[in-house]
Amino acid sequence: MESILMIFAKLPEAYAPFDPIVDVLPVIPVLFLLLAFVWQAAVSFR
């Protein structure tokens, strides 16, 4: 079971160039949360 998880933990070699993009993906929801606060501040928290 652990060997299967290790295979999925590392991207296949074909997707190696996209590795930096995959590292950034988890941050995107946080950016949307910050965007919501900036938007509400812009409209004075109506």
Swiss-Prot record:
Maturation propeptide residues: 1-9
Its job: One of the components of the core complex of photosystem II (PSII). PSII is a light-driven water:plastoquinone oxidoreductase that uses light energy to abstract electrons from H(2)O, generating O(2) and a proton gradient subsequently used for ATP formation. It consists of a core antenna complex that captures photons, and an electron transfer chain that converts photonic excitation into a charge separation.
Keyword Thylakoid assigned: yes
Protein name: Photosystem II reaction center protein K
Superkingdom assignment: Eukaryota
SUPFAM superfamilies, per database record: Photosystem II reaction center protein K, PsbK (SSF161037)
tRNA-binding is among the record's keywords: no
Membrane topology classification: Single-pass membrane protein
Gene Ontology annotations of biological process type: photosynthesis
Signal peptide feature range: none
UniProt family annotation: Belongs to the PsbK family.
Record field: transmembrane: 25-45
Keywords, ordered alphabetically: Chloroplast, Membrane, Photosynthesis, Photosystem II, Plastid, Reaction center, Thylakoid, Transmembrane, Transmembrane helix
Gene name, Swiss-Prot/TrEMBL: psbK
Organism: Stigeoclonium helveticum
GO cellular component terms, semicolon-separated: chloroplast thylakoid membrane; photosystem II reaction center
Coiled coil: none
Location in or out of the cell: Plastid, Chloroplast thylakoid membrane
Quaternary structure note: PSII is composed of 1 copy each of membrane proteins PsbA, PsbB, PsbC, PsbD, PsbE, PsbF, PsbH, PsbI, PsbJ, PsbK, PsbL, PsbM, PsbT, PsbX, PsbY, PsbZ, Psb30/Ycf12, at least 3 peripheral proteins of the oxygen-evolving complex and a large number of cofactors. It forms dimeric complexes.
